[in-house]
């Protein structure tokens, strides 16, 4: 996806990002252990992308329709302070995130992959999705990309989609991953 001047400006001024979990931070597959525990796999490539975004000072949120303990565990590991899980109304959760951190909705990107994410995407200043998001979501985000407020990753959910977004934010801010990695992450 070509980075337009308006997208570059949007990525440069972005203050926060809210992620759906399943299909964005994971590959969307559901696996159970022999004891019946739900298992999720996260990519270290995406984990590094989140770490770089944190070091740039972006506020983070996880907003998931699933209410699994893995969401809390991931948030704790990544120092993500806002978690809304088991929610059908992701737009309301996004508004709560904005209010809690003193953000305007147009300062936030919502990164989702399926139709239940569209409601939050519609009120966010920017939306992003993995390459393998639902067709309706890819169309919506692609339409927003025409005005610089949408980002369709070249990678699939759970295997680099978030990292490509992080790399685009770094490029828009004339930052290298190496230099940002050396920065101290905000508490």
List where the protein language model places each region.
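Non-catalytic pre-domain segments flanking phosphatase-related domains
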Residues: 1-19, 175-187
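Asp-based phosphoryl-transfer active-site loop
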Residues: 10-30, 121, 162
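Short coil/turn segments at beta-strand junctions that form active-site/ligand-binding loops
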Residues: 13-15, 58, 106-107
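Fold-independent oxyanion-binding glycine-rich loops
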Residues: 20-22, 28, 66, 113, ...
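A positional/architectural concept
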Residues: 24-55, 64-65
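Mg2+-dependent phosphoryl-transfer enzymes with acidic/Ser/Thr/Gly-rich catalytic loops
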Residues: 36-40, 77-78, 82-84, 91-187
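Substrate-recognition element of Asp-dependent hydrolases with the DxDx(T/V) motif
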Residues: 50-74, 85, 121
